[in-house]
Amino acid sequence: MMADEELGDEVKVFRRDEDADDDPMISGETSEQQLADDKKEAVMEAELDGAGRNPSIDVLKSAFPKVEPMSPSFPGLMSHFSPGYSAAALPMFMPLFMNPYAAALRSPSLMFPMGAMSPTFPMFPPSPVYGAAIAAAAAKQHFENMAPLNMRAGHPMNQMGMPPYMHPSSMAPQNVDRRAQGGGKAKKDDHVKKPLNAFMWFMKENRKALLEEIGNNEKQSAELNKELGKRWHDLSKEEQAKYFEMAKKDKETHKERYPEWSARENYAVNKKKTKKRRDKSIPSENNDQKKCRARFGVNNTEMWCKFCKRKKKCEYATDRSGGSDITDSQDGRGTSGAYSSSSESPSPKANAGIALTTQQQQAAMMHTMLMQMRLGSTTGASTHVPSPLASSSAGRSPLDANASDSESDVEEEEDEQIDPTVMQQTHDMLMQESMCTI
């Protein structure tokens, strides 16, 4: 009685009155054959829909299994979703229905390559209509499509012309071959080693024997070379002659093989500094261009200028573009005792005072000669015009006093030579002033 009452209550909740007569659950009729037919029809409809849809959407759908109806009472459970965006194609909505194979291919951002799965490879158990041959072909295509789209040769996303995708296992033998060949770095073919000398031949023959001796295995290369050098010096000339002969033959063979070779070609540093060395190798025309080190030597540092002592630019070295310096005859550093001509450039530092003194002396000499010529011209004339320059010593001007002082200086330094250019300038000025006075 209790079971009948519970059955009656369930019928009142879920059953409608107008469908009471047609309900197979109430009538008690069996529908196993009808359920099997419904399953076959659903599979056929899904295959027909997949053939007419966009393959890109089918790729997404094929990565997830299709949920079968639980019972005939729930035939339209998944029909509420649109055909293009079914629940099986949306991992964020239905993550529990995802196939474990598709989950392995999914990236952390729930996105995976469009061609990771084949549209023709179903993830749910195939229907009895298809045979084992179709399943095998689909599995083969599935493994071929495991490569990303951007690595496929004919895919439009491969716009950079990348090589076809290759499995890492196929590239392993190439890596092994590259390591066996020496690491992949190409050696320079144009580098030619110079021939070995006698000592190098001696080292080449005896180095291995030296390493085999007890206690030499842990020594460094420098220590081994030192020991080989001692043994080389201990050899007699007859024993060394053997290695000299080997070095001679090696040099001749090397010369025949590389007739135009020179050892300088192996040193690129010298190639870069060739131009600079040529510029510095310009010979000096006179001794004035030399520094104190070249003039007086390394032992005579007391004669060096103060700049050379501090390793600075020499005081007496001139620029290559200019003339020579004024030589200093007072301290013994000059090359000649006479002063340089007016066309030569004076030294800007230490010789500035000397040049100023020389100019003052020349001006005084010019003034003295001018006064003498004026006095001679005025005494011979008929009319004497008094001039302040010819006044007495008591009332003479400062210029006359300077002239008289300079006369004594000139008498004391009669041995000095006067530049002919200065003499010519003095003569011209004298003639002009004489004409003005007359």
From Swiss-Prot:
Residues covered by region (Sufficient for interaction with beta-catenin/sys-1): 1-45
Gene Ontology cellular-component annotations: beta-catenin-TCF complex; chromatin; cytoplasm; nucleus
Phenotype reported upon loss of the gene: Knockout specifically targeted at seam cells causes an increase in seam cell number, but this is caused by a combination of anterior daughter cells adopting the seam fate, and abnormal differentiation of posterior seam cells. RNAi-mediated knockdown also increases the number of seam cells as a result of anterior daughter cells failing to differentiate and adopting the seam fate. RNAi-mediated knockdown in L1 larvae causes a severe loss of M lineage-derived coelomocytes and sex myoblasts.
Pfam families: HMG_box (PF00505)
Region (Disordered): 1-39, 250-288, 318-351, 378-438
Region called Involved in nuclear asymmetry, residue ranges: 88-130
Segments of skewed composition (Basic and acidic residues): 9-18, 250-263
Effect of residue 9 to E: In q645; abnormal gonad development and hermaphrodites are sterile. Formation of ectopic M lineage-derived coelomocytes on the dorsal side and ectopic sex myoblast on the ventral side
UniProt-annotated location(s): Nucleus; Cytoplasm
Polar residues biased stretches: 324-339, 378-395
Xref: InterPro entries: HMG_box_dom (IPR009071), HMG_box_dom_sf (IPR036910), TCF/LEF (IPR024940)
Predominant place of localization: nucleus
Acidic residues: bias regions: 406-418
PANTHER family attached to this UniProt entry: PROTEIN PANGOLIN, ISOFORM J, TRANSCRIPTION FACTOR 7 FAMILY MEMBER
Protein name listed in UniProt: Protein pop-1
Organism: Caenorhabditis elegans
